[in-house]
Amino acid sequence: MSALIEVSGLSKHFGGLQAVKDVSFAIEPGEIVGILGPNGAGKTTLYNLLTGFIPYDSGSVVFKGRDLRGLAPYRIAGLGISRTFQLCRPFVGMTVFENVIVGGLGASGGGGSGLDAHAHALLKQVGLAGKEQLAVETLSYGDQRRLEIARALAAKPALLLLDEPFAGLGSGEIADLSALIRRVHADQGLTVMLIEHKLHEFMRLVGRVIALDFGEIIAEGSPEDIVRHPAVIEAYIGRGDAEAEEQTNAA
C-alpha cells in the first residue's frame, strides 16, 4: 500500500532557531499516528508546514502523490487535509451550523442542499444536534472542541490533523471526545494525526507514535515501545537519578 502522505527532509528555521530539522516519515491510509513531544518540540510547527500555513525551507511533502510545496492552505484543504487548532477558532458572529457550512465550502462537490445535509449529519455525529442555530460564542468549551472537529470534517478530508483536542477538557469530556475520534476514524475511513499531552488517552488512541524533541524525530514506533524509549524519557523528565548521581560523583 502506498503512503497517503510522505514527508522527506522537512526543515524550518525562524531566524537562528531551527524549529523543524530534517523530519521524514510516511503515513499509510487508515492509520492513527500520534505526534509526541514536550512543549517547544516543533509539533504544531510541523502541522503548520504540512497545511501550508507557513512555508518550509527545505524538504518535501507529498500527499496522494502530489507535491504540496508552495500551495496555499485552502488549496491543501481542498486536496484533502483538514486540521483543528490548539485553541478553538470558531467564526464568531455566526451560528454553529454556519461554521460547519464554511468548513465545507472548499470540498469537492460542496455547496447547495448537499452541503446543508452534510453539515446537519456532522453536527449529529459530533453530538451538537439541536444546537445548529446557537451563536458559537454561547457554546461550552467542550462543545467548541466538537464543533472544530465537525468543521474540519465538513471538507471531507482524507487526512485529519488534530492539535491537542483534549486541552482544557475534564476527564469525562476527554473520554467522550476520544470515543468520537474513534467513531469518526472507523466510520469514515479517515487517516488521523494527533498531537496531545494527555498521554493516557493519547496512547490508547494511536497505533503508532512519532516522537519529536527540538524539532527532530528522536523515536518512532508503537505506543508500548515509545513510553520505554530512553530518548523519549529523557526528553520528558531529563536524566535519571542514577546518571545524575554518577556525574556528580565524577565531578
Model-derived regions, located:
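Glycine-rich phosphate-binding loops of nucleotide-dependent enzymes
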Residues: S2-A251
